[in-house]
Amino acid sequence: MESKQLHSIIGIWTNACRFLLAVVFIFSGFVKAVDPLGTQYKIQDYLEAFGWAASVPAFLPFLASILQAMVEFCLGVYLLFGIRRRMTTLFVVLIMGVMTPLTLWLALSNPISDCGCFGDAVTLTNWETFGKNVFLLIAAASVFKWGNRITPLVTKRFDWLVAMYAFLYISGMTLYCYHELPVFDFRPYHIGADIRKGMEIPEGAKPTVYETRFILQKMEWRKNLH
């Protein structure tokens, strides 16, 4: 009896983790796809934080933004429908295994204010992002360990059709939003937004302080002006 109950609990837990990860990956991939340039700028922020910006070709951040959106979205769809369970869960646990320590470093050193996990749609602090990733890593490890407990929503005869549709959909969405405007614009100054209201400093927030410095130098004489 205990064995059957444990088997049932593991199955429920695994599928709950599977659906949670599917929603997160689909949403994350989608919001990156609707604003590929915004994702590119965030990747450039990461490169600058690591000191790699000067050594990386200019086209790579944009290419990486497209690939990231497509991979996350497709993995989410694969998890949702239970397609290629072993391969999908392996990729998911590897991604979370890399992102979790990375976000811990971001939380400790704070080189950038927002990880960009969900684009401009949802803004999280670095510590909130790390906490989220710890939970998702546990979920990813669970679906990887008990991947055979994932209940497929489509048969193997039709899983290729779902996979192809997911790939074509997210590819088309990314290219359309690159050439046109985002179909869902999460940016702070989107069309129809009140720019004056958007520029207001929130109550209690510290205003940005700028310092202008001029350096006058002639031969060995040098003077700083503030």
Where are the model-predicted features located?
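Membrane-interface helix-boundary motifs at transmembrane edges
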Residues: 81-88, 148-158
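Membrane-embedded alpha-helical segments of integral membrane proteins
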Residues: 97-150
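Short, Lys/Arg-rich, polar N-terminal cytosolic tail immediately upstream
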Residues: 1-12
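Internal/C-terminal transmembrane anchor helices
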Residues: 153-183
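Perimembrane loop-to-helix junctions flanking transmembrane segments
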Residues: 42-58
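Interfacial/capping segments of alpha-helical transmembrane domains
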Residues: 32-45
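Functionalized membrane-embedded alpha-helices
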Residues: 11-33, 58-102
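Membrane-interface segments at or immediately adjacent to transmembrane helices
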Residues: 172-226
